[in-house]
């Protein structure tokens, strides 16, 4: 398991992209991600050796008790065995936000699960089936 990216909710995607680029970051993908019948614009930015996904509304946000505040909102873990990682997280006290879903977009194809830790950390487990994102340095 490793951290693949962080997710952040922002009020203005284009303004945030320009800000990150002004800091030396790079727009890797400006992607539309289909999830539960809706398309979400979720640009992927690279800053040094890390990725950052940004969105004006997170794909799982409708399933939460209240809307997310702006700022960092979840961490994405890349894993090899999604079933085992999800079961381990649930057994350790995590709650499921959205069931395992297959998502295909500009980044490739992934199986994803959205969960919340007992302490409230929102996280995503991702099994990459096809990767179309450039490797980090």
Model-inferred region functions:
Residues 30-33, 41-45, 90-137:
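Vicinal oxygen chelate
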Residues 61-62:
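A cross-kingdom feature marking solvent-exposed beta-strand/loop segments within repeated
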Residues 2, 41, 48-50, 71-73, ...:
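Residues that flank catalytic or metal-binding motifs in active/ligand-binding sites
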Residues 19-23, 88-93:
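Short amphipathic alpha-helices in soluble, non-transmembrane regions
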Residues 1-17, 72-77, 126-137:
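N-terminal beta-strand motif that seeds the catalytic metal site of vicinal oxygen chelate
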Residues 15-17, 82-87:
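Short, conserved charged micro-motifs
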Residues 8-51:
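Core segments of cupin and vicinal oxygen chelate
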């Amino acid at each position: 398991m490793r951290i693949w990216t962080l997710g952040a909710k922002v009020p203005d995607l284009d303004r945030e992209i320009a800000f990150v680029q002004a800091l030396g970051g790079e727009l890797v993908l400006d992607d539309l991600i289909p999830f539960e019948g809706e398309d979400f614009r979720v640009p992927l930015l690279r800053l040094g050796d890390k990725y950052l996904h940004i969105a004006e509304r997170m794909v799982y946000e409708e399933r939460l008790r209240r809307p997310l505040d702006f700022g960092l909102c979840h961490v994405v873990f890349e894993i090899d065995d999604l079933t085992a990682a999800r079961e381990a997280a649930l057994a350790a006290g995590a709650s499921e936000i959205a069931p395992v879903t297959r998502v295909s977009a500009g980044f490739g194809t992934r199986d994803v699960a959205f969960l919340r830790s007992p302490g409230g950390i929102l996280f995503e487990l991702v099994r990459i089936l096809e990767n179309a994102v450039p490797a980090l340095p």
